[in-house]
Design a protein with these regions (language model features):
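Short, conserved beta-strand element in jelly-roll/cupin
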Residues: 34-36, 45-62
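Short histidine-centered beta-strand/loop micro-motifs
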Residues: 20-23, 33, 41-46, 64, ...
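Ligand-binding loop in jelly-roll beta-barrel domains
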Residues: 82-108
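A short, N-terminal "cap"/entry segment at the start of jelly-roll beta-barrel domains
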Residues: 1-29, 42, 111-129
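Short acidic-glycine-tyrosine-enriched beta hairpin
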Residues: 66-82
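Short, charged/polar surface micro-motifs in flexible loops or helix N-caps
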Residues: 26-28, 37-40, 57-61, 104-108
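A generic "binding-loop/recognition-motif" signal
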Residues: 28, 37, 48, 68, ...
Length: 129
């Protein structure tokens, strides 16, 4: 199939994996995520990648450069420009479900990380080569 066509809200709400790549193009990538209560992605920076986040369920705290904080809820979006240190923390009572668009792509096509531990292990292996 060329591109991605689907109900992204339903796909996001159905997803229970920490990270799942739905589509990878030459210049952008669509990813769904699910963070457990209290879970966070960890402070990170992508020097060459812009990110768009859309919250579909739950509440999240976005922290930029370890000081600027924004609490967002279902239906809200956040843009994280390349070069911005950021963290996303699930501050709600249940699962945080979101989708994000990376531009350019950030993960290998078809990536599925069932848990944060799986994602951390894959990152470690990727950076050790």
């Amino acid at each position: 199939m060329t591109g991605y066509v689907g109900n992204i809200e339903k796909q996001t709400l159905k997803n229970n994996y920490f990270r799942q790549v739905l589509f990878t193009g030459e210049k952008a990538q669509l990813v769904v995520m699910c963070l457990q209560r209290g879970e966070e992605i960890g402070n990170e920076v992508h020097h060459e990648v812009d990110q768009f986040f859309r919250i579909e369920q739950g509440e999240a705290k976005f922290i930029f450069h370890q000081k600027e904080e924004h609490v967002v809820h279902d239906g809200e979006a956040v843009m994280v420009p390349a070069g911005t240190f950021h963290n996303v923390i699930n501050t709600g009572r249940g699962k945080l479900k979101l989708y994000k668009i990376y531009s350019p792509p950030n993960h290998p096509d078809g990536t599925v990380h069932k848990s944060k531990a799986d994602a951390d292990k894959a990152e470690e292996e990727h950076h050790s080569h």
